[in-house]
């Protein structure tokens, strides 16, 4: 049969090709119209081939097919009885009808059409290959897009994909068999009609928008293709159709799945929340209400219905607001879940409303209103609303932090919950690189650190986390965080903050960040230099909680993991009424009697702040205990027990902060505060050396509770009055203890007004106390800052006892005291005042000591000249005899006065006649002119010295003259033993002047004899002449002597620098060394001439002896001894100098003053400004 078919096909090849070409041209020209007519004609011609023919064709194929595949291929063809399995009944009837009607014309038409189709397929082979490549590209692109859509959706089940793959395999096999069947069969019309019918059905299902020409061309290409390629091509086409079906079906499934949870959400919200609770319980999270089963058992059906109506999301039935209010009013049972949910919603509204009204002035008022409501039940809502409000308005962060600080002082668990949520929010934002959330949360944490709600360790951890990975955003967040809490961190832990600033400096030097961020770092350093003056830690109006009343939470970034979001949801409470009553009682204790008043009774913000601070202090509870009439035992056993407990707590604690917390928890009464302070002071005094633990502890206690400041002030005043009762060790410990309190400003500096430093009230114990007290203050503050503190106007009145300015004697004593303890720099003002004081004292008419001493000599000068002359005329001898013993006393006083004047670089001036007013005026003029070159301190000592220089008026008596002269000689002998060289010079001068003095004595004797003989003749004339001559001589002698002595003393008082003095000594030593050689040469020359040896000893006396020759060894030995002596002196000087704390120049002047003038000296060193007075 195959051979006959092949022979019949050969002669018909050419016409078929021609027809195909003509058909192709016509199809191309006609376009869509020809394709439509072609499909309409084919619809009527349905395949009705016999089943046996199909089976024979399948068996004659080159490759074998299994039976199942054969049956599947033959399923669509009708059997002999006319039935078809796959087609519906109508189709099978139509096929039978067509087969019977067209049976006569069938064989001729089929042969012609099959030949034409084959010729057209050969001509269109090239166009088919091109179209195939394009189809492959499109199929690849669609497969990719489908794979991405399927991966994104992820909702297609595995079973569906398996069924789809099987269906694809079946259809591809059917297609391959049909195409192969068309090639080996004579009646090609059957194959063409079946395939076109199938394509039409697929187009109807999909509703594709492609043109009929394109589908027709693809159909023809599929016919032309070889049997090996045809299954793949058909497979790709079928896959496209299946993909479209699968995508549409997938979308439907996804839509169904999305609609399912909406129905579930409409269920009861209460049970959904309780399921969450049960899940949290299984995970180990806390739940107060028990498991879900217990809660479901507790709620009745009636309560559940009302709860569904009020709390479900859909709202149940459509309820008007009036009807909803009526339903809510009917619910009065507080134990029901509906009532509790309504109360919770009302609480949520109140909290949101109050938090939105907060500002700087109304913080205290709003916190009081919040504390009236049960914020313990709504703590989750409260924290959530505060965080949300702070995120929306970051400028009010400090206000929200102050409100949280007040709530935290009363309910620490609420403050801890809010802080945990903030930390978790910051960690999540940091992980997601959300800069805005990081800024808001870190800003809030910084202000909580300032309010002492959060510990500073949390702030340091956040800073290290941000700076470890220095990006632009991280550094910007760190800078804003440091600006807000930098002032507080520098107060608490300055070293760690300094390390963070060093890291920022390194980041700035690297220059890897943006210029804007680098500029921000520079601005931060400038803010730090200014001391964060524009970024204060707490504003005064927001410092509402005392330090001792605040509870600080120590949280770490790693520890905080669970934010407790379940507290934001509603939970049913069995004991609702009892819990509400407990909270009301607690709020009354917190707010006091004002808790029951109306909101308008709180008044302004300032009054509310004071009321809140009084509540915070907790004094009302103590007063209630005293007024309740309870008997308080204040006998000794209680005091002993108190001492024991305090002593044990002091010894058991490792840190002063821990100890302060424990001591403040003891809740001491007001009468026990003085005893408490005294116990602390006794424990400090009993130590061998001072321990800073006690100073830090008292500072902490005084800052936590300011009522302890006054007892410590009273104790300080008592100790200043009773220093003689204490041991030196206790005195030192107590003085250092109070110095620490003053340095830290724990107590005010006004307590120093009880100290008086005068010569009359000076006691050794008090001096020891003041010495150690001031030295400890200088160690803490430094001399410059301490002096600056003392010069403030506030302390001017309190330091009048320590630095007196009323009396020069007290001034001098205070200066000497402070210089002796090494604090002479404090007394610069007193030294200047002492220089000015003697000038102003005589001019003033006050009753000071200066005026009283200066007024004494004026009384002696009040006598007139006439009275003196009358007295001295007749009673010269008597006056001399009477005044001789008084002169001795006066001269002894003169020696003391001269020593004082020599110590203060001054000269002594004698007054000869008090009778002569003219001579007195001249003397005062010379005195004032000479004193201009001398320091002002010398004038004061001269003024204080007693006036004992008045001479006797009985100058006519020779005996008085002789005695006066002899005593003058003795005075010169007593004065001059200070210097050996001066002695020698004065002895030589005395030896030269001795004959002149003898002659003078003789002359005076002759004058006396002549005067005695001529008394009877002319008493008055001789007396007057002799008096005038002798007065003139005495004036000349006094002036000459005073001038010479002034010059000598002034030269001695000219202070020379230590370096110049050493150079002078070295020159003298060098001259002394070379003196023996000069004397040797001179003596050798004298001996040659026959003259005696003219060598002089150290005193200037000549010696007649030979000079002993020195050997070199002896010279070396003496030099070494001299060096040893010099080294020992210098070593002792350096040791004393270091002990006194002086420089070399000061020590040299000090030693000179101690040796020559043990009264005063002043250093000329520019660096030291050291003065010493005695």
From Swiss-Prot:
<feature type="region of interest" description="Disordered">
    <location>
        <begin position="840"/>
        <end position="1045"/>
    </location>
</feature>
<dbReference type="GO" id="GO:0000398">
    <property type="term" value="P:mRNA splicing, via spliceosome"/>
</dbReference>
<feature type="compositionally biased region" description="Basic residues">
    <location>
        <begin position="869"/>
        <end position="909"/>
    </location>
</feature>
<feature type="compositionally biased region" description="Basic and acidic residues">
    <location>
        <begin position="910"/>
        <end position="924"/>
    </location>
</feature>
<feature type="region of interest" description="Disordered">
    <location>
        <begin position="79"/>
        <end position="110"/>
    </location>
</feature>
<comment type="similarity">
    <text>Belongs to the CWC22 family.</text>
</comment>
<dbReference type="GO" id="GO:0046661">
    <property type="term" value="P:male sex differentiation"/>
</dbReference>
<keyword id="KW-0221">Differentiation</keyword>
<feature type="compositionally biased region" description="Low complexity">
    <location>
        <begin position="16"/>
        <end position="35"/>
    </location>
</feature>
<feature type="compositionally biased region" description="Basic residues">
    <location>
        <begin position="1034"/>
        <end position="1045"/>
    </location>
</feature>
<feature type="domain" description="MIF4G">
    <location>
        <begin position="348"/>
        <end position="531"/>
    </location>
</feature>
<dbReference type="GO" id="GO:0071013">
    <property type="term" value="C:catalytic step 2 spliceosome"/>
</dbReference>
<comment type="subunit">
    <text>Component of the spliceosome C complex.</text>
</comment>
<feature type="compositionally biased region" description="Polar residues">
    <location>
        <begin position="93"/>
        <end position="102"/>
    </location>
</feature>
<feature type="compositionally biased region" description="Basic and acidic residues">
    <location>
        <begin position="235"/>
        <end position="259"/>
    </location>
</feature>
<feature type="region of interest" description="Disordered">
    <location>
        <begin position="1"/>
        <end position="51"/>
    </location>
</feature>
<feature type="region of interest" description="Disordered">
    <location>
        <begin position="597"/>
        <end position="616"/>
    </location>
</feature>
<feature type="compositionally biased region" description="Basic and acidic residues">
    <location>
        <begin position="1095"/>
        <end position="1118"/>
    </location>
</feature>
<feature type="compositionally biased region" description="Low complexity">
    <location>
        <begin position="1010"/>
        <end position="1020"/>
    </location>
</feature>
<feature type="compositionally biased region" description="Basic and acidic residues">
    <location>
        <begin position="183"/>
        <end position="200"/>
    </location>
</feature>
<keyword id="KW-0539">Nucleus</keyword>
<keyword id="KW-0508">mRNA splicing</keyword>
<dbReference type="GO" id="GO:0048024">
    <property type="term" value="P:regulation of mRNA splicing, via spliceosome"/>
</dbReference>
<keyword id="KW-0726">Sexual differentiation</keyword>
<feature type="compositionally biased region" description="Low complexity">
    <location>
        <begin position="926"/>
        <end position="957"/>
    </location>
</feature>
<dbReference type="InterPro" id="IPR016024">
    <property type="entry name" value="ARM-type_fold"/>
</dbReference>
<comment type="function">
    <text>Male determiner protein (M-factor) that controls male somatic sexual differentiation. Acts as a dominant factor that regulates the mRNA splicing of transformer (tra) and doublesex (dsx) transcripts and promotes expression of male splice forms of tra and dsx. Probably acts as a component of the spliceosome C complex required for mRNA splicing factor and exon-junction complex (EJC) assembly. Hinders eIF4AIII from non-specifically binding RNA and escorts it to the splicing machinery to promote EJC assembly on mature mRNAs.</text>
</comment>
<feature type="compositionally biased region" description="Basic residues">
    <location>
        <begin position="963"/>
        <end position="1001"/>
    </location>
</feature>
<feature type="compositionally biased region" description="Low complexity">
    <location>
        <begin position="138"/>
        <end position="153"/>
    </location>
</feature>
<feature type="compositionally biased region" description="Basic residues">
    <location>
        <begin position="201"/>
        <end position="223"/>
    </location>
</feature>
<feature type="compositionally biased region" description="Basic and acidic residues">
    <location>
        <begin position="79"/>
        <end position="92"/>
    </location>
</feature>
<dbReference type="GO" id="GO:0030154">
    <property type="term" value="P:cell differentiation"/>
</dbReference>
<dbReference type="InterPro" id="IPR050781">
    <property type="entry name" value="CWC22_splicing_factor"/>
</dbReference>
<keyword id="KW-0507">mRNA processing</keyword>
<feature type="region of interest" description="Disordered">
    <location>
        <begin position="1095"/>
        <end position="1133"/>
    </location>
</feature>
<dbReference type="Pfam" id="PF02847">
    <property type="entry name" value="MA3"/>
</dbReference>
<dbReference type="GO" id="GO:0030238">
    <property type="term" value="P:male sex determination"/>
</dbReference>
<protein>
    <recommendedName>
        <fullName>Male determiner protein Mdmd(V)</fullName>
    </recommendedName>
</protein>
<dbReference type="InterPro" id="IPR003890">
    <property type="entry name" value="MIF4G-like_typ-3"/>
</dbReference>
<feature type="domain" description="MI">
    <location>
        <begin position="641"/>
        <end position="757"/>
    </location>
</feature>
<feature type="compositionally biased region" description="Basic and acidic residues">
    <location>
        <begin position="1"/>
        <end position="15"/>
    </location>
</feature>
<feature type="compositionally biased region" description="Low complexity">
    <location>
        <begin position="840"/>
        <end position="857"/>
    </location>
</feature>
């Amino acid at each position: 049969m195959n051979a006959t078919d092949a022979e019949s096909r050969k002669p018909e090849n050419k016409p078929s090709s021609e027809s195909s070409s003509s058909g192709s041209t016509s199809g191309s020209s006609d376009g869509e119209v020809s394709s439509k007519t072609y499909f309409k004609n084919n619809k009527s011609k349905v395949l009705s081939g016999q089943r046996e023919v199909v089976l024979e064709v399948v068996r004659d194929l080159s490759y074998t097919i299994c039976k199942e595949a054969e049956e599947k291929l033959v399923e669509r063809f009708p059997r002999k009885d006319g039935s078809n399995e796959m087609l519906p009944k109508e189709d099978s009837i139509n096929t039978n009808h067509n087969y019977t009607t067209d049976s006569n014309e069938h064989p001729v038409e089929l042969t012609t059409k099959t030949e034409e189709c084959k010729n057209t397929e050969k001509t269109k082979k090239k166009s088919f290959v091109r179209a195939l490549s394009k189809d492959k590209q499109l199929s690849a692109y669609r497969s990719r897009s489908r794979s991405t859509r399927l991966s994104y959706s992820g909702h297609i089940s595995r079973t569906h994909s398996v069924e789809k793959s099987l269906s694809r395999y079946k259809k591809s096999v059917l297609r391959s068999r049909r195409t192969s069947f068309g090639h080996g069969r004579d009646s090609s019309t059957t194959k063409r009609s079946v395939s076109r019918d199938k394509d039409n059905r697929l187009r109807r299902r999909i509703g594709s928008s492609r043109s009929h020409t394109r589908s027709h061309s693809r159909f023809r290409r599929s016919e032309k293709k070889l049997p090996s390629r045809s299954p793949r091509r058909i497979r790709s086409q079928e896959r496209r159709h299946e993909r479209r079906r699968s995508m549409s079906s997938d979308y439907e499934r996804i839509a169904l799945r999305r609609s399912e949870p909406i129905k579930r959400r409409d269920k009861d919200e209460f049970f959904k929340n309780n399921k969450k609770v049960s899940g949290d319980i299984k995970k180990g999270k806390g739940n107060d209400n028990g498991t879900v089963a217990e809660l479901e058992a507790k709620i009745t059906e009636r309560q559940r219905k009302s709860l569904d109506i009020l709390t479900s999301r859909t709202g149940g039935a459509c309820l008007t607001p009036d009807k909803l209010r009526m339903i809510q009013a009917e619910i009065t049972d507080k134990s029901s879940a509906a009532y509790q949910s309504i109360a919770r919603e009302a609480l949520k509204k109140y909290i949101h409303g109050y938090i939105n009204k907060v500002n700087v002035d109304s913080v205290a008022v709003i916190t009081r209103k919040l504390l009236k409501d049960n914020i313990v039940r709504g703590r989750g809502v409260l924290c959530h609303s505060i965080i949300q409000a702070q995120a929306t308005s970051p400028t009010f962060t400090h206000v929200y932090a102050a409100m949280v600080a007040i709530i935290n002082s009363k309910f620490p668990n609420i403050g801890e919950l809010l802080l945990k949520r903030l930390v978790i929010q910051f960690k999540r934002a940091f992980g997601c690189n959300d800069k805005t959330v990081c800024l808001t949360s870190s800003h809030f944490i910084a202000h909580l650190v300032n309010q002492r709600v959060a510990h500073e360790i949390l702030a340091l951890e956040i800073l290290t986390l941000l700076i470890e990975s220095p990006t632009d955003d991280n550094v910007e967040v760190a800078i804003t965080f440091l600006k807000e809490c930098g002032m507080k961190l520098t107060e608490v832990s300055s070293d760690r903050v300094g390390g963070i600033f060093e890291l920022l400096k390194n980041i700035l030097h690297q220059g890897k960040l943006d210029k804007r961020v680098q500029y921000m770092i520079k601005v931060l350093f400038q803010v730090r230099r200014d001391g964060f003056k524009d970024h204060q830690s707490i504003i005064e109006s927001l410092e509402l909680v005392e330090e001792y009343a605040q509870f600080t939470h120590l949280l770490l970034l790693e520890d905080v993991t669970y934010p407790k979001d379940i507290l934001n949801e509603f939970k049913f409470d069995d004991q609702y009424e009892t819990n509400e009553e407990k909270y009301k009682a607690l709020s009354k204790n917190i707010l006091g009697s004002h808790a029951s008043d109306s909101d308008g009774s709180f008044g302004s913000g300032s009054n509310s702040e004071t009321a809140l601070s009084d509540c915070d202090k907790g004094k009302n509870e103590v007063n209630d205990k005293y007024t309740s009439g309870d008997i308080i035992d204040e006998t000794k056993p209680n005091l002993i027990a108190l001492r024991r407990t305090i002593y044990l707590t002091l010894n058991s604690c490792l840190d002063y902060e821990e100890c302060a917390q424990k001591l403040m928890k003891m809740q001491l009464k007001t009468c026990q505060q003085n005893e408490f302070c005294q116990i602390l002071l006794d424990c400090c005094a009993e130590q061998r050396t001072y321990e800073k633990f006690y100073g830090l502890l008292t500072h902490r206690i005084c800052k936590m509770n300011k009522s302890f400041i006054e007892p410590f002030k009273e104790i300080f005043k008592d100790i200043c009055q009773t220093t003689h009762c204490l041991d030196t060790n206790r005195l030192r410990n107590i003085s250092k203890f109070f110095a620490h309190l003053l340095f830290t400003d724990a107590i005010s500096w006004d307590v120093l007004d009880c100290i008086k430093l005068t010569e009359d009230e000076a006691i050794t114990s008090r001096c020891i106390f003041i010495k150690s007290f001031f030295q400890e203050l200088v160690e803490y503050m430094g001399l410059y800052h301490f002096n600056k503190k003392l010069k403030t106007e506030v302390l001017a009145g309190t330091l009048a006892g320590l630095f007196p300015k009323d009396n020069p004697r007290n001034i001098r004593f205070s200066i000497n005291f402070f210089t002796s303890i090494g604090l002479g720099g404090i007394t610069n003002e007193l030294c200047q005042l002492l220089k000015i004081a003697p000038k102003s004292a005589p001019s003033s008419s006050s009753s000071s000591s200066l005026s009283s001493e200066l007024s004494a000599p004026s009384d002696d000068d009040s006598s007139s000249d006439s009275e003196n002359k009358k007295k001295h005329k007749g009673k010269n001898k008597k006056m001399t005899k009477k005044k001789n013993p008084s002169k001795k006393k006066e001269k002894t006083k003169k020696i003391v006065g001269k020593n004082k004047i020599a110590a203060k670089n001054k000269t002594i001036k004698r007054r000869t006649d008090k009778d002569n007013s003219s001579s007195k005026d001249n003397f005062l003029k010379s005195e004032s002119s000479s004193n201009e070159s001398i320091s002002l301190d010398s004038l004061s000592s001269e003024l204080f010295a007693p006036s004992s220089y008045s001479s006797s008026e009985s100058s006519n008596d020779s005996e008085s003259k002789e005695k006066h002269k002899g005593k003058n000689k003795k005075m010169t002998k007593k004065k001059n033993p200070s210097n050996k060289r001066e002695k020698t010079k004065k002895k030589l001068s005395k030896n030269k002047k001795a004959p002149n003095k003898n002659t003078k004595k003789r002359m005076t004797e002759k004058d006396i004899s002549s005067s005695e003989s001529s008394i009877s003749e002319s008493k008055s004339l001789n007396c007057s002449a002799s008096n005038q001559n002798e007065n003139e001589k005495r004036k000349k002698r006094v002036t000459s002597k005073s001038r010479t002595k002034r010059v000598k003393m002034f030269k001695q008082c000219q202070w020379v620098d230590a370096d110049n003095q050493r150079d002078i000594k070295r020159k003298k030593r060098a001259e002394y060394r070379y003196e023996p050689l000069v004397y040797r040469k001179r003596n050798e020359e004298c001996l040659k001439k026959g003259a005696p040896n003219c060598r002089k000893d150290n005193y200037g006396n000549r010696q007649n002896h030979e000079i002993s020759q020195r050997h070199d060894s002896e010279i070396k030995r003496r030099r070494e001894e001299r060096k040893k002596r010099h080294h020992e002196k210098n070593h002792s000087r350096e040791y004393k100098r270091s002990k006194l704390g002086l420089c070399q120049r000061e020590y040299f002047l000090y030693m000179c003053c101690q040796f020559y003038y043990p009264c005063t000296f002043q250093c000329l060193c520019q660096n030291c400004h050291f003065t010493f007075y005695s």
